[in-house]
A protein has these predicted regions:
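N-terminal subdomain of nucleotide-sugar transferases
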Residues: 1-65, 115-116, 198, 384, ...
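A conserved mid-protein helix/loop that constitutes part of the nucleotide-sugar donor-binding site
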Residues: 17, 217, 221-246, 250, ...
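Short alpha-helical donor nucleotide-sugar binding micro-motif in glycosyltransferases
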Residues: 164, 280-281, 288-293
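Carbohydrate-associated surface elements
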Residues: 176, 199
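Nucleotide-activated donor-binding/catalytic signature segment of Leloir-type glycosyltransferases, i.e.
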Residues: 263-281
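Aromatic "clamp/platform" in nucleotide-sugar-dependent glycosyltransferases that forms part
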Residues: 301
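Short hydrophobic beta-strand element within catalytic cores of glycosyltransferases
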Residues: 318-321, 331
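Conserved acidic donor-binding segment of nucleotide-sugar-dependent glycosyltransferases
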Residues: 333-334, 338-345, 354-359
Length: 403
């Protein structure tokens, strides 16, 4: 059995629910997965689903580690591997200054936990710098899943080439992501790259009843409330729809630093009656919201391979999204969804109005969207693809080569 440490930035988390699905399916595939999370869950335990709550019971939360355990981890590692320990501190400082020293401290905590559990390999999502330092200090191998888009904006500052070089292999969730890694990695490291798309559970996200004449028309947008997600463009677009006499409700699911500014924008435009802020929703609540929705809108300025699009499309909800980064790998314009130039409120309003006014188009795009997810973003099939990569790339027992 291959034994792996999964190092995640925050687990479970509303915005990273795909990680929970991936971990649980890999276990069903026969892998022994032990999860370490840098931060605790993003919600109180009472707001978690039963599955999420179950996962917290076996997860090692690094920033909640008792001080005594942390001191013991550092003391043991310094005595057992002094050169690697001190070299890890120096490398952390070089990578990210004072923040890099925090990453170094976390790396020692995770690496010592791996030593005690005899875990020879660490795979990381959203914690690649900590993973890099673990592989420097401890005799373990490293693999990384890169999501984007943030880390692709400043690849030198994110040290992407160095991380790919240090890894046994690295995964991109889209062809776009793989191209960005190829742009910064040495060509001799290109054979390390794998494309492992995300996916959704097609039974959990089954088609919702189609509504030919909704009143009001229900729109939903799901994602962190942050400037990069483009929600202000969506607010400007729906103002145009309101002025043209369309009857609708827009529900924004998510939370984030832009909440107050978005609320003020909605109020200033006189849209408070038709724009509702739902806050963070767990998966059960989100599926309920999808079932009430006639269209999903994702007006982002940058994206990796957004799972929210896959979820909505799996439920036969037509989608309107920005033509950026990995999104065209999910939606083919006017075949199984509509794509618009990022930042163009007029184009976004026109695309939504097309779906409001054309019942046949709305139904056709929803049906084709479901078919696209069945073909390319089936969760079990895509996790099986990742499992095949792990089996091919790791030794039979997952053991790392010592140093």
């Amino acid at each position: 059995m291959i034994r792996i440490a999964y190092l995640l930035s925050q687990y479970p988390a509303v915005n990273h629910v795909f990680m929970l699905r991936e971990v649980r399916l890999l276990r069903k595939q026969g892998f022994e997965i032990h999860v370490a999370s840098i931060r605790p869950p993003d919600r109180d335990l009472g707001a978690l689903t039963s599955v999420e709550h179950q996962e917290t019971q076996s997860t090692n939360y690094i920033r909640s580690m008792p001080v005594g355990r942390l001191v013991a981890a550092h003391g043991y590692t310094l005595l057992a591997r002094p050169a690697r320990y001190l070299g890890g501190a120096v490398r952390g400082w070089r990578l990210a200054g004072f923040k890099g020293l925090l990453y170094f401290g976390e790396a020692v905590a995770v690496g010592d936990w791996m030593r005690r559990k005899r875990l020879p390999h660490v795979h990381t999502h959203y914690a690649a710098t900590v993973g890099l330092l673990i592989s420097h200090i401890f005799p373990v191998t490293l693999s990384i899943t890169f999501h984007g888009p943030g880390e692709f904006v400043n690849p030198a500052g994110s040290h992407l080439g160095e991380k790919v070089a240090a890894s046994l292999f690295s995964c991109a969730i889209s062809r776009y992501g793989a191209s960005q890694l190829m742009a910064v990695a040495k060509c001799t490291d290109w054979p390390k790259l794998e494309i492992t798309p995300l996916g959704v559970d097609l039974e959990e996200f089954s088609p919702r009843p189609f509504r030919p004449a909704p009143s009001p028309f229900q729109m939903v947008s799901v994602g962190r409330l942050a400037p990069v997600k483009g929600q202000h463009v969506l607010i400007a677009a729906v103002e145009r729809l309101a002025k043209s006499g369309h009857c609708f409700v827009l529900r924004l699911a998510g939370d984030g630093p832009d909440l107050r500014a978005l609320q003020q924008d909605v109020h200033a435009r006189g849209l408070s009656e038709c724009v509702i802020f739902e806050g963070n929703l767990n998966q059960d609540q989100l599926r309920g919201l999808y079932r009430q929705s006639d269209v999903l809108v994702l007006p982002s300025f940058a994206e990796g391979l957004p799972v929210v699009l896959m979820e909505a499309m799996a439920m036969a909800i037509p989608c309107v999204a920005s033509w950026v980064d990995g999104i065209p790998e999910i939606i083919t314009h006017e075949v199984d969804g509509l794509l618009i130039p990022p930042g163009d409120a007029e184009a976004l309003a026109n695309a939504i109005a097309r779906l409001m006014d054309d019942v046949d188009l709305r139904q056709m795009l929803g049906q084709r969207a479901r078919a696209k997810v069945l073909e390319k973003f089936n969760l079990e099939r895509n996790v099986a693809r990742l499992a095949a990569v792990l089996r091919q790339r790791l030794p039979g027992d997952g053991a790392a080569v010592g140093r």
